Amino acid sequence: MQDRFTRRGIMATAGAFALAAPVRAADKEPVFDDSEPTRGVAIPSVQHTDEMAAAPLIKKKVNKLWNDAPTIKEPNALQFTPTGTLLILDQVDPNKVFEVNPSDGKILRTVQTESIHGSGITIDGGGNWIITSTKALQGPPVTLVVDPKSGKTLQKWVTPGWGFYGPDRPPRPGMPPETPSGGHDVKWAGNGRYWMAVPASGRIFLMDEASGKAVRSLVAPVNRTHGLAIDGNFLWSVAADFYQIHKLDPKTGKIIAKIQLDKKSDPAIHGLEIRDGVLWYCDAGSGWVCNLT
């Protein structure tokens, strides 16, 4: 196992980025120092707020398919395999990956990993898993390449833009200190690259797996981008706090359309995946796995 890198620049300084208005993908990429957390990125921007309001609404029905609790306690990410089974990342630490039959949720196998508070899983071009850890026992949060049979970490690197998302929050008496956040969902894009949402940075990164560096990034539409899914020429992203799923142009990050769920009756949206044009999602809070039709 090796650390691919500990410091690199992919975006201007973290402090400058925190004060600057979000830019589109075509603008100059800011730079993050991996040794220091990002703080206080103010999103969503007025531009994205207007886009969310104006985006056409795609009406979908939420189907609650199955719930494997208490075995799978906190399903936080989904990934279909080439054989049609479904991988579920449980964020209970240290994280386990469950391979299940998507038709009924029957657990086919379980793999223990070294991930901590994982929030994203995908399969790379060589069949290994890429898992994002939103937290860390020590040091900054990392992204892992994992052996799908043993669960052992093959490689790891510091997640770009890790830190504290949303506005700065002063310490509250009697409350534990705020912990930094790393990557949320991750999805393989082909050609050695994958998309990764990092809420603290206010960005969705297109990453190069071989170098562990960002190729480019999109300004995230919201403060807490969670799940991701790739559908042909479009990228879907979860706006968890809004109970929305956004259809994005992966070249510009523009919101093309949105799906609105009901906060009162529908399970919350965390992990996201798509299969045969149907979006699937999971809720780490209630344990439900759902799809949208």
Residue ranges with predicted function:
Residues 47-71:
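A short helix->beta-strand "capping" segment at the edge of beta-propeller domains
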Residues 88-92, 131-139, 196-200, 237-242, ...:
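Conserved beta-strand positions in repeat-built beta-propeller and related beta-rich domains
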Residues 101-104, 147-150, 208-212, 249-253, ...:
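Short loop/turn segments that connect beta-strands within beta-propeller blades
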Residues 96, 138-142, 246, 288-291:
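Structural motif
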Residues 70-82, 114-125, 161-189, 221-232, ...:
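Beta-rich, blade/repeat-based domains predominating
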Residues 273-293:
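Blade-level signature of beta-propeller repeat domains, shared across WD40, Kelch, NHL, RCC1
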Residues 62-68, 106-111, 152-157, 166-176, ...:
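A short beta-strand motif characteristic of beta-propeller blades
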